[in-house]
From Swiss-Prot:
Binding site for Zn(2+): 47, 50, 96, 99
Stored InterPro entries: Met_Sox_Rdtase_MsrB, Met_Sox_Rdtase_MsrB_dom, Mss4-like_sf
GO MF annotation list: peptide-methionine (R)-S-oxide reductase activity; zinc ion binding
HAMAP family reported for this sequence: MsrB (MF_01400)
Domain MsrB: residue ranges: 8-130
Descriptive protein name: Peptide methionine sulfoxide reductase MsrB
Length: 135
């Protein structure tokens, strides 16, 4: 897997201000404001920064949190995790393995079969509808 490395200026030129804040500065969009939290269409969710496939709609569920939630990544090799001690909490941060974009966090309160909840910012994702993803 080839890493994608860009300067801060290159990321700022490529991304919207919100995408840049979330993915490059480890920000979080407000709950229930992202464009994908309630998306029920079939398709593929990829990294907004580099296009790496991350999640499929089949593993997305309504966690009631206001962020897109998935119980499993498409390919575990496409994400990486780091311990996050920010904001006085201990969490596990989820990042894109290719470009190091901050995606969100993973929690151990998800549904079967994994028991995991990948709580991901909409601003970190690009959605490709199933009809377009299969062509």
């Amino acid at each position: 897997m080839t890493k994608v490395v860009k300067t801060d200026a290159e990321w700022q030129a490529q991304l919207t201000p919100e995408q840049y804040y979330v993915t490059r500065k480890k920000g979080t969009e407000r709950a229930f404001t992202g464009c994908y939290w309630n998306n029920k269409k079939p398709g593929l969710y990829s990294c907004v920064c580099c296009g790496t496939p991350l999640f499929r709609s089949e593993t997305k569920y309504d966690s009631g949190t206001g962020w897109p939630s998935f119980w499993q990544p498409l390919d575990p090799n496409n994400i990486r995790m780091e311990r996050d001690l920010s904001h006085g909490m201990v969490r596990t941060e989820v990042l894109c393995a290719v470009c190091d974009a901050h995606l969100g966090h993973v929690f151990e309160d998800g549904p079967p079969p994994t028991g995991l909840r990948y709580c991901i910012n909409s601003a970190a994702l690009a959605f490709v509808p199933e009809s377009a993803a299969s062509s």
